[in-house]
Amino acid sequence: METDLNSQDRKDLDKFIKFFALKTVQVIVQARLGEKICTRSSSSPTGSDWFNLAIKDIPEVTHEAKKALAGQLPAVGRSMCVEISLKTSEGDSMELEIWCLEMNEKCDKEIKVSYTVYNRLSLLLKSLLAITRVTPAYRLSRKQGHEYVILYRIYFGEVQLSGLGEGFQTVRVGTVGTPVGTITLSCAYRINLAFMSTRQFERTPPIMGIIIDHFVDRPYPSSSPMHPCNYRTAGEDTGVIYPSVEDSQEVCTTSFSTSPPSQLSSSRLSYQPAALGVGSADLAYPVVFAAGLNATHLHQLMVPGKEGGVPLAPNQPVHGTQADQERLATCTPSDGTHCAATPSSSEDTETVSNSSEGRASPHDVLETIFVRKVGAFVNKPINQVTLTSLDIPFAMFAPKNLELEDTDPMVNPPDSPETESPLQGSLHSDGSSGGSSGNTHDDFVMIDFKPAFSKDDILPMDLGTFYREFQNPPQLSSLSIDIGAQSMAEDLDSLPEKLAVHEKNVREFDAFVETLQ
């Protein structure tokens, strides 16, 4: 499609659409995990804050989404679909909903890619967060357990709505116009859940030990494209190695970014700090297993001691019980290897010997590990970020100085120098200037401070006391009922005397009136 976009705008638009597609998959799948997701706001975010949302990526979901996209982007005639289905322990399955991200030919050539498209994609992603929690599949996902699980499938191509049955409903999440077409995000969901009415799906403890997804297809088999939304237990052994976090965040390296990505940390998936072991030929990093996570899915190795360290996947997967025990082995004081028990500084973690097989130096490896990918609109300086790793579409968002937060003058301003005030000379007393006592307390004159609202007997008077006193002033004596009645009675009693005085001096009063005419 012929457009007037320059190469930079076209590159940014492709990045925005690709990253929006990946975030869309993350939002949909995380909404079907069966648990509430709570993220805390931050005034100075340090994670991947694309579209101004704290959506922490699950590496498995990102891997599946990138594999489904296969380098393509949603365009006219090519739609990205996320299918959510249900599968019971008896083997019955039913499609619940299909989310579709597509693009039509209606273009908006006047719109600006730099900010307008980005902000509208952010609003569309926020709308998706709300819509994913109002469809019937959300309530079913909250009740999944031993009886059934929720699966997801990502495919690229024509939308397949035949599995939803008759009478399904559709909802359009929103649209965003771009210079190359209009992005549309919609959902078709099943409303007939008669298949579910014959059973009671409750979270009851099993009579005997049952693997939660024993009847569910394994995550990446060649025969089935379905994947469970929830995490697998530690007893599974599929031999799957997911790409490193850095690889999963490859799409985040657009020009917007100035902050590293953050990964999912929840009750089911979490990384814990571990000691760093150093071998003679390889980098030996002990694997930390998280509760509820597949042991084989933790082939990602964790480099501790660096805040925001990136897990590194080994070159070759290790299988078998012996290999698992080797990965679980921890360093003890009796071992011959060097262990950083309390890695508190970067120097401890970088004490790694060179490989005897001619591999890359450990310094290069660590430098590769800690090159951080960054999110959007965050100008927090990070010492690991280099200018060569920043591909920013807006030059104004490039970090001015690559320095630590501790030395950032905006975070920790330097102490102001002690300079002599220009008013100090005018406050010097004449007696102290000629003396040689040198006492600093004699260099100033005591000023008698008398504010306008203060009184002589209460000095100084508090401003609050002054305000309260004049806010509720005493009542005027003339307005008092008792005093008014008393004065009226006195006037009536003295009225005859006043009339007698007037009659006596009536001629003088008449003469005065004539002078006024």
From Swiss-Prot:
PTM characteristics: Phosphorylated by ULK1, ULK2 and mTOR. Phosphorylation status depends on nutrient-rich conditions; dephosphorylated during starvation or following treatment with rapamycin. ULK1-mediated phosphorylation of ATG13 at Ser-355 is required for efficient clearance of depolarized mitochondria.
Modified residues annotated as N-acetylmethionine in this record: 1
Polar residues: bias regions: 342-358
Family: Belongs to the ATG13 family. Metazoan subfamily.
Sequence positions bearing Phosphoserine: 355-356, 361
Primary location recorded for the protein, binned into one broad class: cytoplasm
GO terms for biological process, alphabetical: autophagosome assembly; mitophagy; piecemeal microautophagy of the nucleus; protein localization to phagophore assembly site
Gene3D superfamilies, per database record: HORMA domain (3.30.900.10)
Gene that this polypeptide is encoded by: ATG13
Function noted in UniProt: Autophagy factor required for autophagosome formation and mitophagy. Target of the TOR kinase signaling pathway that regulates autophagy through the control of the phosphorylation status of ATG13 and ULK1, and the regulation of the ATG13-ULK1-RB1CC1 complex. Through its regulation of ULK1 activity, plays a role in the regulation of the kinase activity of mTORC1 and cell proliferation.
Organism whose genome encodes this protein: Pongo abelii
Keyword Acetylation: yes
Residues covered by region (Disordered): 333-361, 405-439
Residue numbers covered by motif LIR: 444-447
Known partners and oligomeric status: Part of a complex consisting of ATG13, ULK1 and RB1CC1. Interacts with ATG101. Interacts with ULK1 (via C-terminus). Interacts with ULK2 (via C-terminus). Interacts (via the LIR motif) with GABARAP, GABARAPL, GABARAPL2, and LC3A. Interacts with TAB2 and TAB3. Interacts with C9orf72.
Domain writeup: The LIR motif (LC3-interacting region) is required for the interaction with the ATG8 family proteins GABARAP, GABARAPL, GABARAPL2, and LC3A.
Location(s), subcellular: Cytoplasm, Cytosol; Preautophagosomal structure
Cellular component per GO, a single term: cytosol
Protein name as catalogued: Autophagy-related protein 13
InterPro entries in alphabetical order: ATG13, HORMA_dom_sf
